[in-house]
């Protein structure tokens, strides 16, 4: 009897420990409903000087004049329009998580998305981002960028307390398909490395420029200026009237952000030693 009780106690301990070290879901959204939920997401505030409401040739929608993006058929529809009712520029979207994600033992991001346009000169972004405290240029960032100019691959980039600019770019081809197809994009952000995956295939690992501060998650779409020649197209210009407006979009099927469980023996940290079950029967 004592042996049975001892075994039950050990099993309970093992189950409890496995629960403690299991990855935790921090944000999940499959975008069911008619619009993106304000309990999970927001767009920039125009009055904030650090909100980045203008990038390239694009002004992002902001809370004072726009609603959150629509959802359709289980997808968030992230749009950029050629007509901007408030200025002569493109009118884009920068959807941001309400949460900020601290590195801890690691963060794992999984996004299923596709671009709905092949018109050259448009960029769709899937990324983590944060300006450094007190700065408007130094920042941390880990990203996937989908360029309609280069539809058969995706640009990856990373910054660690670096100025806005070129960063540390690596362009990777898709294992199959193009930006017009749904793909699963993953970022695994560890304390000592960052890995990018597409459709389960490892496409890049970075061990040098690894950010450590908390970051917010973004989904955006915008039109760059000539300062980014690989992504810019001089033939794509803002519309001068609502009647000539064009709408371009990225569909996001789901977002899943979770913590990464602490390392195990495979990464050099020894697990709890196995327990010897002794027969305690008198």
Q: Where on the chain are the PLM-derived regions?
A:
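Bacterial N-terminal signal peptides
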Residues: 7-16
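Positively charged n-region of N-terminal signal peptides that target proteins for export
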Residues: 1-4
């Amino acid at each position: 009897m004592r042996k049975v009780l001892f075994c039950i106690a050990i099993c309970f301990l093992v189950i409890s420990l496995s629960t403690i070290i299991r990855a935790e879901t921090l944000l999940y959204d499959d975008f069911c409903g008619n619009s993106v939920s304000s309990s999970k997401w927001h767009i920039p505030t125009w009055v904030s000087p650090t909100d980045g409401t203008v990038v390239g040739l694009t002004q992002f929608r902001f809370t004072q004049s726009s609603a959150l993006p629509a959802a359709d058929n289980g997808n968030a529809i992230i749009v950029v329009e050629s007509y901007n009712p408030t200025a002569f520029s493109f009118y884009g979207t920068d959807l941001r998580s309400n949460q900020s994600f601290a590195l801890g033992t690691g963060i794992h991001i999984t996004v299923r998305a596709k671009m709905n346009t092949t018109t050259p000169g448009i960029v769709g972004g899937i990324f983590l981002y944060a300006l450094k405290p007190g700065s408007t240029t130094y920042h941390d960032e880990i990203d996937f960028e989908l360029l309609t100019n280069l539809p058969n691959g995706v640009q990856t980039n990373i910054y660690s307390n670096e100025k806005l600019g070129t960063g540390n770019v690596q362009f990777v081809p898709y294992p199959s398909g193009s930006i017009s197809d749904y793909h699963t994009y993953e970022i695994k952000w560890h304390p000592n490395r960052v890995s990018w995956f597409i459709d389960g295939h490892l496409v890049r690992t970075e061990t040098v420029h690894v950010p450590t501060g908390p970051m917010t998650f973004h989904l955006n779409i915008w039109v760059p200026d000539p300062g980014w020649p690989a992504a810019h197209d001089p033939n794509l210009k803002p519309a001068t009237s609502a009647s000539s407006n064009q709408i371009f979009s990225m569909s996001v099927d789901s977002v899943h952000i979770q913590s990464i469980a602490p390392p195990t023996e495979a990464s050099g940290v020894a697990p709890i030693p196995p327990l010897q079950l002794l027969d305690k029967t008198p």
